[in-house]
């Protein structure tokens, strides 16, 4: 409809593996759809999201830049403005990660923040945790103060503002002793609010609250006043993310051309490893490294496509052919021949037998030739 590529998908044949992976990373899904709701700077980057448009503030104000804006007329009268934002850190379609991280990506982590931390710390050597746990009562209250896990060695003393994300069923979040402070791209000033509501949260996705001052208390409540059974709250670490992004982007797969069924590009690496791609895994994909067919690997809970590559500079081509495509062509041709045979059955039988069914062969009639007298009769004188 809008003629652009998007991460959001509605399909009756949506892969169950895609749904499972989206769920584990905190993105919104249903039985026949997956959505951009629940994205973080990491998941937006992993799926190569470059742009976002909105009629107001962007979803991740700390991680985008205003690219352009345009006014338009509303059907109901008046006018509005649409803003185009560009993400600051977008990973390419493919990049190298440690092959040993496959096990981590396929494991269950308990909550999406731990899952995302596991990705960055295992995908690259020296990767840092990008989410740090906050104090909560486990159900409906968050305090803007760190409660670091045992394996989180980050020194976060002196933090004055927390970029807070949380995950639970829900939701309206209300701030006490502080306010949500988002970077405003429209008026270049700080905007504040004390509450934020999230739609369709019964499908469980990560909610981004925004920048909250240290010590503030956030109360979480469900719109239908139902009890919240569990809640996870973390602060995003922009410094760690910048560091991890540079590590992940060190060996990018650079696309040189693409179409609906073919992607071509190059990759340079000084050691063999796993090429991670955000291409949904499907047996219809074939990959060729320097012209030689290579094996694809299902990664990220079987949702995405990976390829093992050796050290060096490689030309890597992905080709897609729907499963059963050639068998379908053969069956279609055979079916067409059978149909034509039924339609022209009588004529085919005529050609085979050399005569029409039930007709008689006409007999040859002798030709009677009439003599014509060309000579005039003789007259006696």
Please provide the spans of the model-predicted regions.
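Short, flexible loop/turn elements at secondary-structure junctions
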Residues: 6, 53-56, 89
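Extracytoplasmic/lumenal acceptor-recognition loop(s) of multi-pass membrane glycoenzymes
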Residues: 1-47, 91, 97-101, 108-115, ...
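Active-site-proximal, structured, solvent-exposed surfaces of multi-pass membrane proteins
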Residues: 127-368, 372, 378-381
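Flexible loop/turn segments at secondary-structure boundaries
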Residues: 1, 59-61, 173, 325-326
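Periplasmic/luminal catalytic loop of GT-C fold multi-pass membrane glycosyltransferases
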Residues: 30-74
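Catalytic cores of secreted or luminal carbohydrate-active enzymes
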Residues: 45, 58-63, 79-135, 224-243
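Solvent-exposed loop/turn and edge beta-strand elements of beta-rich ligand-binding domains
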Residues: 71-74, 92-97, 103-108, 122-124, ...
